[in-house]
Design a protein with these regions (language model features):
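Periplasmic/extracellular electron-transfer cofactor-ligation site
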Residues: 51
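Short N-terminal segments immediately surrounding and downstream of signal-peptide cleavage
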Residues: 22-36
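A flexible loop/linker signature enriched in serine peptidases of the S9 family
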Residues: 21-24, 42-48, 56, 61-67, ...
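Cleavable N-terminal signal peptides
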Residues: 7-8, 18
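Positively charged n-region of N-terminal signal peptides that target proteins for export
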Residues: 1-5
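Short coil/turn segments that connect the beta-strands within blades of beta-propeller domains
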Residues: 35-37, 75-77, 119-121
Length: 144
C-alpha cells in the first residue's frame, strides 16, 4: 500500500509539472477512485481522468462553464462534480467513461459536493451568498 501511495504521489507531481507549463494554477481538485486505479481532477475548467500508472488523461466534461470538485461514487462508475453551467454552482453526475451530465441540484445558491455515501447520497455544502467566482471557500454556507 505504501508503494502504491508513493507511486500515486509521484504521478500527481509529474502530472502537475506537465500542466505547469501552461499555468501552475490550473490543475486542481483531484479525487482518487475507490479502487485506487484512477484519479479524477479539474484542469482548465473541465474534469479529466488519468490512470494512477500514468498515461494520457481523458477529458470527461466539455463545457464553456467551469466544472470542478470531482468526487467518485463508491462503485467507481460515476463522477459527481460541481459546475457553473446555469449561472450558479450546481451539482451534476456523469459516467466515469464520459457521456451526458445529469444535473442533481438547481438551487439559486452555490452547491459544492463534499462526499458520496455508500448508498449514493451526496453530502454537499450550499452557500446562499455569492462567493467570488470559482472561489474555494464559500461564505455563509451550510452542510446538507
Amino acid at each position: 500500500m505504501k508503494n502504491k501511495l508513493m507511486t500515486l504521489a509521484a504521478i500527481l507531481m509529474v502530472t502537475a509539472s506537465a500542466f505547469a507549463q501552461d499555468s501552475p494554477l490550473w490543475l486542481r481538485k483531484n479525487s482518487i477512485s475507490p479502487d485506487g486505479e484512477q484519479i479524477a481532477f479539474t484542469y482548465k475548467g473541465n474534469i479529466y481522468i488519468v490512470d494512477t500508472d500514468g498515461g494520457l488523461a481523458r477529458q470527461i466534461t466539455t463545457n464553456p462553464a467551469y466544472d470542478t470538485d470531482p468526487l467518485w461514487s463508491p462503485d467507481g462508475k460515476t463522477i459527481i462534480f460541481a459546475s457553473y453551467r446555469n449561472k450558479s454552482k450546481d451539482i451534476y453526475k456523469i459516467p466515469a467513461e464520459g457521456g451526458a451530465p445529469v444535473r442533481l441540484t438547481s438551487h439559486p445558491g452555490n452547491e459544492t459536493p463534499m462526499t458520496v455515501l455508500e448508498d449514493g447520497n451526496i453530502i454537499f455544502s450550499a452557500s446562499i451568498q455569492q462567493d467570488a467566482q470559482y472561489g474555494d471557500f464559500p461564505g455563509g454556507s451550510q452542510v446538507y
